[in-house]
Amino acid sequence: RLQTVTGVQTCALPISNLQSITIPAGVTSIGSSAFAYCDALTAIVISDGVTEIGDRAFNGCTSLKKISIPESVETIGEKAFQDTPWLTLKQEGSTLVIINNKLVDGANCSGNIIIPNGVTSIESSAFADCTGLTGITIPDGVTSIGNSAFSGCDNLGSVIIPESVTAIGNSAFANCTGLKSVSLPKQLKKLENWTFIGCTKLTEVTIPDGVADIGIQAFYNCSNLKTIFIPKSVTAIRENAFQNTAWMEAKKAENPMVIVNAILLNGEGCSGNVTIPNTVKIVSGSAFFGCTELTGVVIPDSVTIIGDSAFSSCPKLTSVSVPDSVTSLGGSVFSGCSALTEAVVPAGITEIGEYLFWGCTSLEKVQLPEGITSVGEYAFDQCDALTDVYFGGTQEAWDMVSVGFCNDTLTGAVLHYGESLPVENPSYPKGDLDNDGKIDTSDIFAAMVYVAYKGAGLDSGTTPEQIAAADIDGDGKVDSTDIYYMLYYVALHGAGQKVSWEDVIS
């Protein structure tokens, strides 16, 4: 008997000789797989107050025949009672197993099924792999459809989801290969990951106005999906959400960069040097993944987010300009870019994602901002050419950075504290920050703004070329000394003395 506990944790009690148990008052949750495979367990009493039974909590309890479930239970996880005699008895009594108005199991259903009124949720995996299911009527009053609720129902032809539904879980209709049409409720705010992945007969979908986020691979491999209505309310479209759809192929034929609602979804058809339009705010995950002919990318300062694996496996990519406007840089963004030799991580980034530069075998120099607090696992793994790391902060600040597993190439490189990555062969003449052919007070002012903003930890918008032009003494950083040299240079030239930079420095 459990006492003085408030929760039974994941995989808590895999005890082979446990025969009965009472979950006492005070416990509010039973974790995932908490009693899984306790094959001697025959009975369990769950006291009032428990609100959640986790995924597979009693999975594989092959002797469990008696379960007392109180009305306080609000959530029943995926396959919580799978392979128990208790569930088998329930299935023999009805093809729809309903507990506390929650539809837990319908795996033995076939044909067209009408879910009864009063049901408030369809729980995770309730109809998963129910190949005999051809149609489903969901009553108004159902508010949620759980993860994988109808996944693998390959004969399910159409679904009308009532307006009462506000949440649809991950993979809810994944691989419903016979699904031809679906009506989504207007109250929906997000399409979760893999919601309709592999629905190969789906031809048209209207995403309701109000949806803000479309999850990872939400419609991936919906090969016949030709028509998609995406409202302006959508502000995030995750990795490969529409990949391998007829809609995406048609968009790529129109323009190698597919952009929707200021989100760059796909650029895999691009080659050579590419400039992303300044209307783009987000580069979605895997947007340029495996773009074998891409050699250079210029990212505008309108972009704030670059998703996971956005430029991964671009073997000819030698240069990329990431502006300081980017405040979110996903994992594996440049992994496998084997020709990349230098990289600058934007000033607003505080965490270096896992596998960020993994396998960048030609990477020699990298600039990291002073505000970073952690470097993810494998971020610089297999970067064997890395020799120099330019860190914007002090050695003391670097010592506080948490560096994850498999980053020996990073920690073994030469650290340059308080310095920026030097620009070799800068395109702007020394001192001419606006590249207008003359060196005057406007250039001095631009350098002063850069130094002031950098000191305050802010982004001045100064480009690498401008920074290189302002580094008068060539010590790898721009500071008050460089500004002094510029002032002296302008003053002498104003007095008619045509001195060189070497004269000024000496």
Where are these regions (language model features)?
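Cellulosome-associated attachment modules in secreted, modular CAZymes
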Residues: 421-506
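Structural signature of tandem-repeat unit edges
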Residues: 16-29, 39-52, 62-75, 84-100, ...
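Beta-solenoid repeat scaffold
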Residues: 9, 410-412
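Short, aromatic/basic amphipathic alpha-helical patches
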Residues: 399-409
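Consensus positions within tandem repeat domains that build extended binding/scaffold surfaces
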Residues: 31-36, 54-57, 77-80, 124-126, ...
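Single conserved hydrophobic/aromatic residue that forms the stacking wall/gate
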Residues: 1-11, 15
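Extracellular-facing binding/remodeling surfaces
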Residues: 18, 106-112, 133, 266-273, ...
